[in-house]
Amino acid sequence: MNIHEYQAKAIFVDNGIPTLKGKVAFSVDEAVANAKELGGSVWAVKAQIHAGGRGLGGGVKIAKNLDEVKDYASKILGMNLVTHQTGPEGKLVQKLYIESGANIVKEYYLAILFNRMAEQITIIASSEGGMDIEKVAKESPEKIAKVGIDPQIGFKMFHGLEVARVLGLDKDEGKKLISMIAKLYKLYMDKDMNMLEINPLIKTAEGDFYALDAKCSFDDSALYRHPEIAELRDITEENPAEREAAEFGLSYVKLDGDVACMVNGAGLAMATMDIINYSGAKPANFLDVGGGASAETVAKAFEIILRDKNVKVIFINIFGGIVRCDRIANGILEATKNIEVNIPIVVRLDGTNAAEAKAILDSSNLKNIKAATNLKNGAELVKSLVG
């Protein structure tokens, strides 16, 4: 689960992590009033959406007087903000964060995340803050520190010293940053986060560090332990189809391609997407029907993926185990009774009750269903149908 910057910063403040003063605004008048209350002569007017790249997309502006605050707030609030993380459809800006300015002398990047490859919590830090960290990693890998932490040991001084070394900090600056990282690490662990990112982390002329941005992502499976975090969920930021799918026990993520996928198991789903890409087509979604799929949930999956007008072919790839193939076949029939399906459906069923499933589909007389003998054959069929 993701939260907004202003929500993350409120959590930071509660845990002693330095941030600049700021207030959320839901209207232009409130934005101006917030700037007046904060005082000073410079403010950042920041769009609040669940995506990065807001500045490049025009969603972050620096105002040097109250008239500019009003002007920028008027332009940003209600805009459809498109960034490299939103996709071409963008996100509607419904709230702003008005933040006091600061005398910034240096920007850094800092993140704490779970490194699945290394099976460790990892601190990632760079002297190149305010930029796309993937670009820095590609062009200047020597400017990035990756410090692994064994959760059984926790964050120690030597971890912080390595970060300070790569960032080129002096002794006093290093002490301040290490103290800040220790608090961030504790917060990360205590709140069951997947990722905590500050980009940029700034150093002021006084040598102090502040989180100028804040991005926190939480483990959905652990939210029952943190009702105060669950309350921060903003469902307006979530894809409606993804939210609806979750209510039916389906894992669905919309993508930009034209081949809809319906698969059981996350691993097989990713392999299916890979082979679709390899064949020259593009997946339109990730959809895992899970281990408890029924005919009803399969029908719901059909309903959701067919709302995507970009979809030209549906590829159903099921390996029957816990999910019996005949259930999937009955779900396909149930879906086609209630929804008009005018596009080809490529079906690859193998495993438990695969023969029964094939018989069900054969007896249905559905003309737009094409059977695949294996995964490779399925991908080839999909590619030929997409064109």
What are these regions (language model features)?
Residues 1-197, 202-316, 326-328, 337, ...:
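ATP-dependent carboxylate/acyl-activation modules
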Residues 318, 342-350:
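Short internal beta-strands
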Residues 321:
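Catalytic core of bacterial c-di-GMP phosphodiesterases, primarily the EAL and HD-GYP domains
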Residues 324-345:
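Amphipathic alpha-helical interaction surfaces in cytosolic regulatory modules
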